[in-house]
Amino acid sequence: MLPTILSISYEHTYAYLSKYQTAYACEGKKLTIECEPGDVINLIRANYGRFSITICNDHGNVEWSVNCMFPKSLSVLNSRCAHKQSCGVLAATSMFGDPCPGTHKYLEAHYQCISAAQTSTTTNRPSPPPWVLSNGPPIFGNGSGLIHPPGVGAGAPPPPRLPTLPGVVGISGNPGLFNVPPQHTAVTHSTPSSSTTAVGGGRLKGVPTSTTTTKHPAGRHDGLPPPPQLHHHHNHHGDDTATPTKPSSKLPAGGNATSPSNTRILTGVGGSGTDDGTLLTTKSSPNRPPGTAASGAVVPGNGSVVRTINNINLNAAGISGGDDESKLFCGPTHARNLYWNMTRVGDVNVQPCPGGAAGIAKWRCVLMKRMPDSGYDEYDDDPSSTTPAPNGGDCLHNSSSCEPPVSMAHKVNQRLRNFEPTWHPATPDLTQCRSLWLNNLEMRVNQRDSSLISIANDMSEVTSSKTLYGGDMLVTTKIIQTVSEKMLHDKETFPDQRQREAMIMELLHCVVKTGSNLLDESQLSSWLDLNPEDQMRVATSLLTGLEYNAFLLADTIIRERSVVQKVKNILLSVRVLETKTIQSSVVFPDSDQWPLSSDRIELPRAALIDNSEGGLVRIVFAAFDRLESILKPSYDHFDLKSSRSYVRNTAILSNDSDVNAGEIQQRLRILNSKVISASLGKGRHIQLSQPITLTLKHLKTENVTNPTCVFWNYIDHAWSANGCSLESTNRTHSVCSCNHLTNFAILMDVVDEHQHSLFTMFDGNMRIFIYISIGICVVFIVIALLTLKLFNGVFVKSARTSIYTSIYLCLLAIELLFLLGIEQTETSIFCGFITIFLHCAILSGTAWFCYEAFHSYSTLTSDELLLEVDQTPKVNCYYLLSYGLSLSVVAISLVIDPSTYTQNDYCVLMEANALFYATFVIPVLVFFVAAIGYTFLSWIILCRKSRTGLKTKEHTRLASVRFDIRCSFVFLLLLSAVWCSSYFYLRGAKMDDDTADVYGYCFICFNTLLGLYIFVFHCIQNEKIRREYRKYVRQHAWLPKCLRCSKTSISSGIVTGNGPTAGTLCSVSTSKKPKLPLGVSEEAHDDPQQQQHTPVPITEDAIMGASSDCELNEAQQRRTLKSGLMTGTLQAPPQTLGGHVVLERGSTLRSTGHASPTSSAGSTHLIFAHKQQQQQQQQQQGPLGEGYYHQPDYYSWKQPPTGTGGLKTPREYYNNTGASASSPQQAHEVFYWTQKPNSGQHGKKKRGAGGVPASPSGSLHSRTAAASQVLFYPSYKKTKAGQPTGYPQYAEALDPPLATGNAAAYYQQQQQLRRQQLHQQQQQQLSSDEEQVEQHAHLLHLQRRAGSQQQLPAPPPHMAQYQHEFMQRQYRNKHSNCDLGMGDAYYNQGSVGGADGGPVYEEILSNRNSDVQHYEVGDFDVDEVYNNSVGTGVFNNMRAAVAAGGSRYGGGSLSGGSVSSRSQQQQLKKQQQQQSLAQQRSARRCTADDDDDEEEEEDEEATAAEQLHDSVCDEDEEEDESDLEDDAHGLPPQSDERMRRLMAMQDEDFKRRFQRQLRKHGAPLDYGALPPGSGPQPEHNGAVFGVSGGVGEGSMRGAFRQQQALNAKSPGGRLAVNDLFGHGNSGPPLPPANQTPAQKRQQLQKLSPQSTTSSSSHTSHSNPNPHPLQLTHPHPHQHPPHHQQRHLSAMLDENNTVRCYLEPLAK
């Protein structure tokens, strides 16, 4: 029966760690070993002696030997304790003998408690690797990067000392050492045999108790650490030893009993190189006769030799010799002046030492793994090449199932292709080579009468001039110690103190010089001739020899003195100080003594005084150069960071996959500072009362990390950190603190220089893709954040907006931190910080996703479904929970183990430990599960609500919530895919997993999709955001024309034409199915035939895609049409004049909504209409200026078109009573506002503008506004078909001859008051309400950016003297920007009304976030009430004149109006004359060209125009003075005051401008008494103005303020909402946004025409410097008829906007 085969791996090693135990008993005590019932003792190894100075040493004696052992210790213990449950052995020399007299010894036993049943079934019990059973090795072992030459003591004379066990004969009779030499032996388990002998060459020839000797030098490049030493003070001669296995009591009857070899690829560092290598190991059979070789060659015998290389069974591979085996040889080479012939793998080549040196040199041939770029694939198996297996084959020892041997042979051959024979180590082993000169010095120093000074001088000369070998280093340090010992006795022979000091000082100089020679670079090859352990021993001997000689001098000096010995590589200072002179700390070295390094050591005063003797303190300092290259740290400590290298190098075949992927591996450490030494008194390990401080400079600053303060332990021959701590560190220096004295240095970890960052493992393509993916995602996240920031007026400030803003911020931080982290290395100072912040950002991001899902759930389960408003307390709670919890978790993680953020390979992952799962994985999973749970709950509620009967608005809101939930769920899944793929990719790449690339490309794809998803579903799909994008593109001239002229960038159309080319659009427009036939020629009023042409059809895309800011292919005047879906046909009437586009509509009009002047960017007046009939708009060519163009719904919705195309006079229009009978009543009305260019500014600075340039938006207040602008402001009212009620108050607004003078006089009266207040209001006021409006109002520009052949329009008559400024404004207008309309999808398209006759409601949508602002009433001017009052008197006077002389106005009467007396008309004439004179005087103050202006005023119309211009000029100068006086009358700010004021402001501004326009033209219009259902439309010019035109910005604010001042005594001073839309008779019954407030109407009703007129006349006559009229005490004289009040109901809709429903008019 074959014995049980056990493969030992690291995984099994951890199992052993839990079972193996160690017991100690000091000399004279009893060692007791006891196991649990049912278990028996299985001894592993034992020793009676001493290997450690710390065990059983209560008094700290350092003179005892630490190389003491009794070889038969294990045999004695086995006889007493083997296979027993408990036993006891007395640790005494009577039992074990006395291996080292004078040393206090102890008994040490390593054992294992095994089940008693195992002893009867197991034939072979393999022992674990000895390094697993290490008895607490020092923190850094003896080894170094330098190699231990293989074969030293193993095959070359002098023969090694092998353990002498029962049946084992030591080589050459030398008693062998039992212990395993540190880092140089590995255990090979085999079947027991009877004897072990050694053959020539040092190779072991084994039978039954076979031992395998392998070397594990330090410094492997594959990272596998050599086994740490069991003891640290033994085998100072570098002899190799073997550990025998325990013989078994039962053996199989026959057959080949083989056990696997545990030999790994051996590594070593020869010089500066690192190599992998293996030794050939043997496995013997029980029947193998003694004397057979075990070196790897097949030795004849009764048994077979199982030869393995790197655990590769060469027998199974079919490699038995011949050509296949002949390839496993190292080629010949030259090294160290010797020729090394071809050597078989596993053999040691031995030669005599070169250059006449005594001894032998050795070099071993091993099998090394090829570099990765060798082109061979380690696992490149070809399953197709199989052949039958002879004799059934064998099974690999660590395979779970047997495979055919031929297939195994193929795998072995493939495996061996990755290895090549190599000499190991890099240089031969010349430890036994000694030169003749040093041999001679060694003989002389041992002679009694030799001169120590002469020997020291000769030694310094030899070491500086002769070539030394490895053995010479050992001899030299031994001579140094011998010289110091002899000088200690010889100095007493010199009676003179000075002579003694001189002799010892000379000896010290020679010794220091010799030590410097040994450290010189020329002797580096001599150090490399030594194995690592010998290097450590030689270095320790050198340090102690120098210290002994230095203290020899210090003890000789009896007074305060300082001696400095400075040579090339050593600075030594001996200081003898008197305690009374020590005032502060002692510092070494001085700044000028040692320029090679900036290291510094500081001894505190208290520590020095405590160690004084006889009032003197003796200190020895030393600084060394190049010693750091000798005292290299060993690698007996492990970490989990580079386990992949172990897995790659250990897994030989596919069935090696059971090797744990997390196996431990070495961490490369270097000595990264010079060695500096300080010794105090006679003891080297004196505990100081106060710690010393060391400042050490780093030799290497790149790719190093984790500094550790260490000292050199003379006893352990290793670096240790006991008693030292790191105080601070930076890139170049570290500060340490130690409580004892010895040799100090800094150890640091080395980051693999070939893998500087995470990207080093990426191939070129993947690295580029990762950059692109992260860049795309970052760009889209930034766009989303800027969208939320720049277009915040579009969004409702709600919890969902805040949540998504936080999510975007977290994702942006994650992307940026990941991008930074993958470029950092472990040594970077930012590495740990990046990992910490990335941890926090991921936790915060997942928390926000959870809160977003919870918010959707709470919205559906509460009253928030119909009202999405700001929820500040809830959002603050989200902030606290997300960021607070994340920071708390990270803080706890930092407190528990800060190294978890710095111990990983890359700076984007935490160390995969329990803390990682507790603080990262579990919180993330909790948040994700909670988010998914709330999402499913929300979906269930949505399904339930969808099946119940809800209102229309609830269904709309549910649809919005349903869309949000879907997007959030997809967003969450996509983000999970991104993070999971990135995690698995990093882990896979770290372990060199083949699937890592798959995860990597998945991460690239998912991350890119994440960015696109954020942009598309969170930005593009939102109609509001799309509209704002278009607006932003339009309003910024720095953007390229291709964007601003694209068909998707604006929703306004531009149609131009001249004759047959009418309707030509921008070249960027594309043609689709024509829907909007439109076309009007500029010269239509001149050519009646041309007016009859068929309109040129234009397309929907033309309307949507044209831009007023684009260069067009024609130079004619443009016509604008607000975009909208209009069904039916649009015909151009033959009477169209000016710059307007007239549409005759049929069927239904569906408007996308046009921006109200009182609304924000997201506000509109919705249009609902059905079965609208054709309508006409008639315009009359007039001078460029203000004009009021009112669609004639207030008077007559249907103006019957004339067959001839002529225009009816205004008188005919208002006197026509039969129009309504012949044409149906149209259901709605439309208002168009016009703006006059800023012709009267003369460069004056407007209030609120400051030094800021004019707005480029081309809005109402822009200085670069167009000469003609159209503001589409639709507002519709339901009126009954037939004869609408008359509106007689319109007659008083249309009397130009009477109104012109009054207006001019009014502005003259206000001029002085405003000038007095101008200096108090400069730069102190905010933007006026009109300037607030300009940010929201929508304008479509005319006459903008014409072609090169287009002629600029001629300036109006009153602008003739300002030709230059007019041209400049036209030029600026050409380069101004486009404005934006509304998108079609944003507005509701249905009608809440019904058919004709049914109630139709108006809806006014006002974005509360923009409209609701706080303003004082003081923002409005006072002066306008007077103007309105005068206007009312003028209206009444005009009605009286019409009644008296009806023939002038075409006959008829005014219905519903009052008739004024003839005396009132006379007063108005006088008032007009005075105003004309005053206006001429004020005109001189406005311009420097007044004299020329007076000569040009030849007729009344020109005078009126000039007067209007002068008043405008004065108004611009004085508008800043209008607010200060009335600030005291302001009302407290109200939440809805902004919207109300703007509504009232629009009404006042319209009336004022309407009156001013009529005065300027001076042409009377006959309103008549006919119903407004018939008659032509009023005449007007082609220019259009908006809410606040260019004539006088802010001039309409005073009326509202005055009215508020008059009503300040009313309770609260608020405006009633219902009064906003009441129909009064103080002005035109405008749409809801233009209604006069009830409070103001009541005040105006108190002003009679007589009082108003007389007040105006009195002021004009009596006061040459007019002052404001006193309107606070009006005298009511006549009350106009009161019209119907319309009540308003308001609510907040789902978009957080105010939705007003106006009561329908009476039928």
Curated annotation (Swiss-Prot):
Glycosylation sites: N142, N256, N302, N341, N398, N655, N703, N730
Alphabetical list of InterPro entries matching this protein: GAIN_B, GAIN_dom_N, GAIN_dom_sf, GPCR_2-like_7TM, GPCR_2_extracell_dom_sf, GPCR_2_secretin-like, GPS, Lectin_gal-bd_dom
Extracellular topological domain: 1-767, 823-828, 897-920, 990-999
Cytoplasmic compartment residues: 789-801, 850-875, 942-968, 1021-1707
Phosphoserine carried by residues: S1156, S1255, S1262, S1327, S1328
Comp. bias intervals (Acidic residues): 1489-1503, 1513-1526
Disordered: annotated span: 176-301, 376-400, 1169-1188, 1236-1260, 1316-1335, 1450-1538, 1563-1582, 1612-1687
SUPFAM superfamilies for the chain: Family A G protein-coupled receptor-like
PTM description: Proteolytically cleaved into 2 subunits, an extracellular subunit and a seven-transmembrane subunit.
Record's subcellular location: Cell membrane
PROSITE patterns: G_PROTEIN_RECEP_F2_4, GAIN_B, SUEL_LECTIN
Residues of the SUEL-type lectin domain: 25-114
Keyword Transmembrane: yes
Biased composition annotated in UniProt, kind: Polar residues: 185-198, 256-265, 1635-1650
Main location: membrane
Molecular-function GO terms, alphabetical: carbohydrate binding; G protein-coupled receptor activity; mechanoreceptor activity
UniProt-listed GO biological process terms: adult locomotory behavior; cell surface receptor signaling pathway; proprioception
Assembly, per entry: Forms a heterodimer, consisting of a large extracellular region non-covalently linked to a seven-transmembrane moiety.
Protein name (record): Latrophilin Cirl
Source taxonomy: Eukaryota, Metazoa, Ecdysozoa, Arthropoda, Hexapoda
Name of the gene encoding the protein in the UniProt record: Cirl
